[in-house]
């Protein structure tokens, strides 16, 4: 099939671009390299479509075929979007992304290279031809400029015209299109086919395909889901489409596999989506009110939400009683502490959904307990993890909130409803970073969870980098008991810098005791320690910040590197993020920066920047197919080399 025919079919609706969650992810370098390959006649790969039923004539790409089916373009979405945007001179209707990536591509008649518009060297220079204008106006639109540039040299003029003609003929190029058809081609089968064919490119998830099929029959599904995601984002919680779809699937089918949605009609899906959105908002309110988990950084265990949404489905969208709520939250906290859903997500979710349907929350807890060898207990060593990306950072925040830990200066309990909804609450290093670095402690030791506590911004500024032996003594004298509310050992000897490891061990023991007491109270029944449950999600909530946070203080050059990546349209990383074993779900390390879906966003292998890995952590990361870098310089060289190779295409 010719490229022009594919684009015409997109306009006509015979081929639709599916409603995948990622939108357009290519960078300008990729667009330029793609057209360089087309111009040189290099192979660009085939295309893959999936023939699926369409119950409505309205789809993302136009109207459906007359036989009630539609061809969803699975492999080639980025390429077709690029071809459409450049040849038509505008992004397609379904476009979501940075439109500048598709506009301004120019061709140099002399060097035969493609570059994006740069006024300094292209404005008024006839050697540079606007590629979109060429496709729109044809060769005739460029003849005057070519004649002037050739300056009466007939041979040179012929060369220029031949080069322009080679560009316009790109749309006439024939490419191979494979079509997946047949009632036996389930979502699981189609995903497997796609990922085998497209092993080196952007991966297609089962959620991608399920959403594509849903949007073929209900085009408003994706905008409706995005509206819910935007509302939660305004409240401080960033979720993804795939996550929301997983919740809907659990509510409607009681299963984890997206293939189960194939049997759900549009009317039921619409009803289930509304119910799920309401349930998630209800859960966020309850988690903020009962556990104090009121912003995205501390909301761990997101993969457990489908199970909790399913429970609410059984009870009309509300907890039937406080006992059920507390026991569910007991299960939820333990599930994220032990990585219940970070490995084989669908397997664990199916087990939990089945347990919930068969025996309620008690069966859920029993399944989790058995998976942990019969014990659900927090040990002091569990708090050894470092940084805000550790699984136990949310637990520290939870304990601070539910027990009403006191601020060191004001004495105010750090509960909800204070300080503009905690917008000025900050993470405080009990032993200041600067002093620990002076004494030779590593980044991981400095940023250990057991060295964190939460204070108001004003208190943090007052303490600054004071010697802990001095300022802790002042606090205990002025406000007896305040340190104990933050689980800070009162043995003065432990406040000395040289005794920092012993301080850590003592505080970990105190935190473990507090955690076990509270989690047991959740299991046994409603606790007298209650927080007011908000009636609606707050908007524009400011997450807790780290006082004096400076990326370069811990990782030299990180701030500059992140700025460069943003300018290059590369994916933004997760900062201070836990990296897990993809097979077992066990935590490996906490990375300074982590690109779970590659630097280009769902293209390539996961990338990890982790300066202080142990040999065991390094081996585990390599076994999990992570690309690991220990410095920003090494990562920058890797990125520069990759871009140079792409530019040479």
Residue ranges and their predicted role:
Residues 246-315:
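Structured, charged N-terminal subsegments at the starts of enzyme catalytic cores
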Residues 484-540:
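C-terminal, well-folded lobe of enzymatic/effector domains
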Residues 1-254, 295, 320, 326-334, ...:
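Basic- and aromatic-enriched surface patches that contact anionic nucleotides/nucleic acids
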Residues 446-477:
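Short Cys/His-centered divalent metal-binding micro-motifs
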Residues 336-427, 435:
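Intrinsically disordered, low-complexity N-proximal targeting/linker segments that flank membranes
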Residues 427-429, 456, 593:
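Hydrophobic, well-ordered secondary-structure elements that form the walls
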Residues 532-649:
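Nucleic-acid endo/exonuclease domains
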Residues 76, 417-451:
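Histidine-centered nuclease catalytic patch
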């Amino acid at each position: 099939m010719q490229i022009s025919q594919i684009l015409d079919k997109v306009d006509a609706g015979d081929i639709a671009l599916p409603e995948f969650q990622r939108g357009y992810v290519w960078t300008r370098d990729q667009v330029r390299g793609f057209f360089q390959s087309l111009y040189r006649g290099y192979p660009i790969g085939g295309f893959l479509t999936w023939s699926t039923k369409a119950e409505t004539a309205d789809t993302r790409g136009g109207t459906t075929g007359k036989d009630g089916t539609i061809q969803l373009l699975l492999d080639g979405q980025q390429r077709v979007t690029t071809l459409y945007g450049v040849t038509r001179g505008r992004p397609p209707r379904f476009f979501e992304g940075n439109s500048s990536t598709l506009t301004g591509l120019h061709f140099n008649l002399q060097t035969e290279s493609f570059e994006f518009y740069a006024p300094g060297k292209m404005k008024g220079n006839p050697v540079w031809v606007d590629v979109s204008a060429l496709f729109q106006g044809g060769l005739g639109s460029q003849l005057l400029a070519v004649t002037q540039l050739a300056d009466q040299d007939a041979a040179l003029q012929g060369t220029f015209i031949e080069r322009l003609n080679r560009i316009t003929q790109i749309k006439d190029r024939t490419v191979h299109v494979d079509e997946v058809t047949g009632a036996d081609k389930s979502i699981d089968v189609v995903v497997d086919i796609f990922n085998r064919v497209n092993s080196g490119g952007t991966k297609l998830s089962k959620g991608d395909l399920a959403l594509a099929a849903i949007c073929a029959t209900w085009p408003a599904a994706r905008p409706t889901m995005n509206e819910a995601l935007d509302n939660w984002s305004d409240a401080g919680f960033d979720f993804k489409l795939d996550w929301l779809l997983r919740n809907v699937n659990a509510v409607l089918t009681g299963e984890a596999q997206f293939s189960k949605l194939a049997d759900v009609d549009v009317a039921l899906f619409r009803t289930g989506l509304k119910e799920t959105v309401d349930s998630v908002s209800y859960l966020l309110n309850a988690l903020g009110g009962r556990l104090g988990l009121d912003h995205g950084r501390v909301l761990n265990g997101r993969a457990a939400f489908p199970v909790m949404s399913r429970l609410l489905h059984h009870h009309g969208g509300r907890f039937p009683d406080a006992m059920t709520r507390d026991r569910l939250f007991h299960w939820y906290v333990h599930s994220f502490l032990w990585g219940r859903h970070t490995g084989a997500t669908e397997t664990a979710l199916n087990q939990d959904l089945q347990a919930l349907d068969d025996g309620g929350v008690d069966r859920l807890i029993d399944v989790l307990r058995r998976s942990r060898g019969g014990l659900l207990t927090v040990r002091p060593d569990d708090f050894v993890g470092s940084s805000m990306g550790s699984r136990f950072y949310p637990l520290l925040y939870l304990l601070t909130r539910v027990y009403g830990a006191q601020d060191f200066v004001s004495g105010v309990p750090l509960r909800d409803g204070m300080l503009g909804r905690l917008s000025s609450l900050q993470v405080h290093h009990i032993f200041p970073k600067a002093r620990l670095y002076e004494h030779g402690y590593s980044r991981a030791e400095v940023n250990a969870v057991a060295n964190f506590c939460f204070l108001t911004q004003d208190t943090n500024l007052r303490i600054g980098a004071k010697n802990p032996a001095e300022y802790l003594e002042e606090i205990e004298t002025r406000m007896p008991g305040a340190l104990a509310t933050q689980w800070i050992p009162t043995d003065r000897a432990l406040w000395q810098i040289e005794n920092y490891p012993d301080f850590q061990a003592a505080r970990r023991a105190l935190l473990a005791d507090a955690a076990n007491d509270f989690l047991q109270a959740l299991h046994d029944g409603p606790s007298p320690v209650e927080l007011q449950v908000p009636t609606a999600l707050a908007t524009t909530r400011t997450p807790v910040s780290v006082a004096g946070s400076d990326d370069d203080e811990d990782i030299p050059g990180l701030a500059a590197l992140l700025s460069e990546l943003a300018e290059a349209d590369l994916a933004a990383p997760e900062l201070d993020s836990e990296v897990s074993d993809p097979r077992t779900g066990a935590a490996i390390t906490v990375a300074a920066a982590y690109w779970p879906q590659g630097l280009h966003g769902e293209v390539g292998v996961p990338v990890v920047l982790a300066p202080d890995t142990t040999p065991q952590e390094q081996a585990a990361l390599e076994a999990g197919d992570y690309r690991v870098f220990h410095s920003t310089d090494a990562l920058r060289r890797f990125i520069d080399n990759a871009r140079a190779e792409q530019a040479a295409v």
